[in-house]
């Protein structure tokens, strides 16, 4: 069994957050090593300006210095980025270079499935379309992640 923990609190959106509130939600590099030693988790999900859900029109303003500091404090523990749906190739590549090994893209997968089901028709045919659409998202993401490494 692999255990992943998120250190920090990932918001559902960024709008309406002041800098102080936003910083308070982010992973604190100063406590990463102690947290990992205490919990012995297999992977660490970080909060560096990423949010759950889709980004409206542009990449999020990720705190790259914070991510680099977390990477240094985490040692060989793999880093995870929740809220990675819709990130550009530039951001994916930069995150990989900073040690992110796993990206959660649930919003993109659900959007693909929803679009397939919205076409209507037989439920089994819709399920097959949804599965195919999600497989297409997975394939595109694997190619993007591979290109970023």
Regions found by a protein language model. Give the residues of each.
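Glycine-rich beta-to-alpha transition loops that act as phosphate-gripper elements at the mouths
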Residues: 78-87
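P-loop/Walker A phosphate-binding loop and immediately adjacent motor/lid segment at beta-alpha junctions
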Residues: 76-77, 123
